[in-house]
């Protein structure tokens, strides 16, 4: 069904309070948007870090009397009579279908294709990973995922064990298995990611070779020939002592989810135990790889 959107501008400090006000007047959802497209990276767990100048956007049912909503909001101490706002009618769309229509097969490296499960593969002789990531997890379109997939495609993974630290949709672990790895282990803090990875592994016929764990359940003394972690620079630095022990001696490490400007600080956290390769950049992101000393 169609919706009505009400947008108002405020400071990051007041955004949460105005979000509550919109919900109280009938908004079915509220989102925050940066007015000036200023990036904010790595909020702490449980933290909603907002921009200094923030648009607060409420979504209302199409039958909502928006004049009444505005009249109520005018009594809010942060707004007042005649407060600046924009009301817009949104056309009805099947958002999931629109997203599916825009997700096409993509090639990474020489052998690997990531293909939506609802599309035909472009090359039946290639290494094809059939992916149904849902709306929340990786599809290969982000530069960091692409960097990791290209790295895996260039490795000889035959008979190897691979750990995907922060597995999301399972795209990296499953790609490793399809590229010849004997076993892959996926770890993620989100139970939905574990389920998405499990579903995608079954779709690709590799579920018997993929182990999936929440951090609290992962076995002690886990080791792998190859470890890949596509998360964020902050966690990569903080978890360096944990991640660094996962590769076997002379094992390989691949890290991404890192802005190019953050590469040096991440390298510093791993250089003691790894011989690092030159950093590879794509757009504003980068990949760090190395071998265990």
Swiss-Prot record:
Family (UniProt): Belongs to the methyltransferase superfamily. PrmA family.
Q: Which reaction does it catalyse?
A: L-lysyl-[protein] + 3 S-adenosyl-L-methionine = N(6),N(6),N(6)-trimethyl-L-lysyl-[protein] + 3 S-adenosyl-L-homocysteine + 3 H(+)
Q: What enzyme category does the UniProt record give?
A: transferase
Name the EC number(s): 2.1.1.-
Q: State a GO cellular component annotated for this protein.
A: cytosol
Q: Which SUPFAM superfamilies match?
A: S-adenosyl-L-methionine-dependent methyltransferases
| Organism name | Citrobacter koseri (strain ATCC BAA-895 / CDC 4225-83 / SGSC4696)
The UniProt record gives the binding positions of S-adenosyl-L-methionine as: 145, 166, 188, 230
Record InterPro entries: Ribosomal_L11_MeTrfase_PrmA, Ribosomal_PrmA_MeTrfase, SAM-dependent_MTases_sf
Say if the entry is tagged with keyword Repeat.
no
Gene Ontology process terms (BP): methylation
By its UniProt entry, which NCBIfam families does this protein fall under? prmA (TIGR00406)
Compartments where found: Cytoplasm
Protein's recorded name: Ribosomal protein L11 methyltransferase
Keyword annotations of the record: Cytoplasm, Methyltransferase, S-adenosyl-L-methionine, Transferase
What job does the chain carry out? Methylates ribosomal protein L11.
Q: Name the Pfam families for this protein.
A: PrmA (PF06325)
Q: Which GO terms describe its molecular function?
A: protein-lysine N-methyltransferase activity
On the tree of life, the source organism's domain of life is Bacteria
